[in-house]
Amino acid sequence: MSPSATDTTEGVDPTILTLRKVLTSESEPLARRFRALFSLKHLACLQPPTEKTLPAIQAIAAAFTSPSALLKHELAYCLGQTRNPESVPFLQQVAKDTEQDTMCRHEAAEALGALGYEDSLEILKALRDNQNESDVIRETCDIAVDRILWENSEARKAEKLKTSDFTSIDPAPPLPMTASEPSIPEIEKTLLDTSLPLFLRYRAMFALRDLASPPDLPTATRAVEALAKGLKDPSALFRHEIAFVFGQLCHPASIPSLTEALSNQSEAGMVRHEAAEALGSLGDCEGVEETLRKFLNDPEQVVRDSVIVALDMAEYEKNGEVEYALVPDAGVAAA
């Protein structure tokens, strides 16, 4: 994707230029490019925005020309976390671009939903209703439309949501709190009911996630076990989101089901890659690194790339590094 008309590097902070150069260079190791991306994401997500915010967003978007589907999908995810309207045009362009990888387009559409701006509804509805689009794109846009409508509704203001341990902007909010104690079997029933709208099922998914954190919460293991059943869902999109949630939770009880998903050669690449990255976040658990190394030469590129990044993340977990990021000089630490 070509940079936008407003994309200029003139007068940009040298740290951002260094990170942008690493991120957009095909000769840099993938793991190093991911670390550069997460450094830029930090600057792009600053609230309130600073003079570094827009150049960081533009630097992230500049890498959409990469041939790596894994990297591009992560770019889209990061832009969706910025809470910044400057990210919208880049994401809309990627979502509409049928030449782009499906996984990348899906993530761009999901990111538009996360940002919540109503001017994305027209594009998302058109993709949702286009019978020539893949199930992954149509399902993603269905959820994104519902999320934007919810975000801008009166009903949202009336809902009481449990405070989450996670700062991520999710594809759907958790189910609203009720007067009674949350019933995991009831939420699980909603999660697994394929007759319900995907947005509602995603709300159940994120409600279960919040009941599984922190890991020593009395409901945690039961919530993880309920979520694991979602890895058998007919929708690849749904299965990949379960794996993503497991990556957030870092709960050891998820390791068997993540290992099974990664090991299944007939599973969709977007699910296997998410399972690999989730295992990377559990890299300090016994046997996880050995499992990941088995797939370094997997036939599927996105799985191989994910394992490289996952092993780098596992190394970071073991070393107890403060942040999974690239620090080119002292300047970024103060940014």
From Swiss-Prot:
<keyword id="KW-0560">Oxidoreductase</keyword>
<feature type="repeat" description="HEAT-like PBS-type 4">
    <location>
        <begin position="238"/>
        <end position="264"/>
    </location>
</feature>
<keyword id="KW-0963">Cytoplasm</keyword>
<feature type="binding site">
    <location>
        <position position="73"/>
    </location>
    <ligand>
        <name>Fe cation 1</name>
    </ligand>
</feature>
<dbReference type="GO" id="GO:0005737">
    <property type="term" value="C:cytoplasm"/>
</dbReference>
<feature type="binding site">
    <location>
        <position position="241"/>
    </location>
    <ligand>
        <name>Fe cation 2</name>
    </ligand>
</feature>
<keyword id="KW-0677">Repeat</keyword>
<feature type="binding site">
    <location>
        <position position="106"/>
    </location>
    <ligand>
        <name>Fe cation 1</name>
    </ligand>
</feature>
<feature type="binding site">
    <location>
        <position position="240"/>
    </location>
    <ligand>
        <name>Fe cation 2</name>
    </ligand>
</feature>
<feature type="repeat" description="HEAT-like PBS-type 3">
    <location>
        <begin position="200"/>
        <end position="233"/>
    </location>
</feature>
<dbReference type="InterPro" id="IPR027517">
    <property type="entry name" value="Deoxyhypusine_hydroxylase"/>
</dbReference>
<feature type="binding site">
    <location>
        <position position="107"/>
    </location>
    <ligand>
        <name>Fe cation 1</name>
    </ligand>
</feature>
<dbReference type="Pfam" id="PF13646">
    <property type="entry name" value="HEAT_2"/>
</dbReference>
<keyword id="KW-0408">Iron</keyword>
<feature type="binding site">
    <location>
        <position position="273"/>
    </location>
    <ligand>
        <name>Fe cation 2</name>
    </ligand>
</feature>
<dbReference type="InterPro" id="IPR016024">
    <property type="entry name" value="ARM-type_fold"/>
</dbReference>
<keyword id="KW-0479">Metal-binding</keyword>
<feature type="binding site">
    <location>
        <position position="274"/>
    </location>
    <ligand>
        <name>Fe cation 2</name>
    </ligand>
</feature>
<dbReference type="InterPro" id="IPR004155">
    <property type="entry name" value="PBS_lyase_HEAT"/>
</dbReference>
<keyword id="KW-0503">Monooxygenase</keyword>
<dbReference type="GO" id="GO:0019135">
    <property type="term" value="F:deoxyhypusine monooxygenase activity"/>
</dbReference>
<comment type="pathway">
    <text>Protein modification; eIF5A hypusination.</text>
</comment>
<dbReference type="GO" id="GO:0046872">
    <property type="term" value="F:metal ion binding"/>
</dbReference>
<feature type="repeat" description="HEAT-like PBS-type 1">
    <location>
        <begin position="71"/>
        <end position="97"/>
    </location>
</feature>
<feature type="binding site">
    <location>
        <position position="74"/>
    </location>
    <ligand>
        <name>Fe cation 1</name>
    </ligand>
</feature>
<keyword id="KW-0539">Nucleus</keyword>
<keyword id="KW-0386">Hypusine biosynthesis</keyword>
<protein>
    <recommendedName>
        <fullName>Deoxyhypusine hydroxylase</fullName>
        <ecNumber>1.14.99.29</ecNumber>
    </recommendedName>
</protein>
<comment type="function">
    <text>Catalyzes the hydroxylation of the N(6)-(4-aminobutyl)-L-lysine intermediate to form hypusine, an essential post-translational modification only found in mature eIF-5A factor.</text>
</comment>
<comment type="similarity">
    <text>Belongs to the deoxyhypusine hydroxylase family.</text>
</comment>
<dbReference type="GO" id="GO:0005634">
    <property type="term" value="C:nucleus"/>
</dbReference>
<feature type="repeat" description="HEAT-like PBS-type 5">
    <location>
        <begin position="271"/>
        <end position="298"/>
    </location>
</feature>
<feature type="repeat" description="HEAT-like PBS-type 2">
    <location>
        <begin position="104"/>
        <end position="130"/>
    </location>
</feature>
<dbReference type="InterPro" id="IPR011989">
    <property type="entry name" value="ARM-like"/>
</dbReference>
